[in-house]
Amino acid sequence: MSDQPDRQTKKPFLYVIVCASGIAGDVGILITAAQDANWGVGVVATPQALGFIDTKAVEAQTGYPIRSAWRSPGDPRPLPPPDAIAVAPATFNTINKWAAGISDTLALGILCEAYGFGIPTAVMPYLNSAQAAHPAYSQSLERLREMGVLIGSYEPHKPKAGGGADQYRWEEALELLTPKLSARA
């Protein structure tokens, strides 16, 4: 295991799982909010999300490397284990794969295992209303709710209308997770 200073100080550790979305570059808003609330933060990005975020800025802000690929056996773990997970922004693709138990990326692998470990998890969807109209989406959200996943309140935006970035409440992930973390303490 790597040196894990957040464990030594008893600071809770949050994994922020970032998906490839037009607002992913604003993930620093959630990181700042979590750090201001005394969380340690590590970022796990889907492979496609790496093209949407400023990786150097995120790594400087968190003090940890961004994880996107599985590590080799025997390599040190670059992040402490999570006390909670926020998936923000969560795309249509990731939500549906996660609910179906598909773990073809590190991010999805972590999410699929989180259920078995009982790690409090919040998902903050960001998608358009045409995607949300697909029956798989509502079924996936229902499955995630049954798994105890906390679902953010973002209402899907109109397709090809500029998105709803101004409506996206990054901090809601912490609002959802904090009571769950307090209950575990």
Enumerate the language-model features and the residues they cover.
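A cross-family phosphate/adenosyl-ligand binding-site feature
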Residues: 1-185
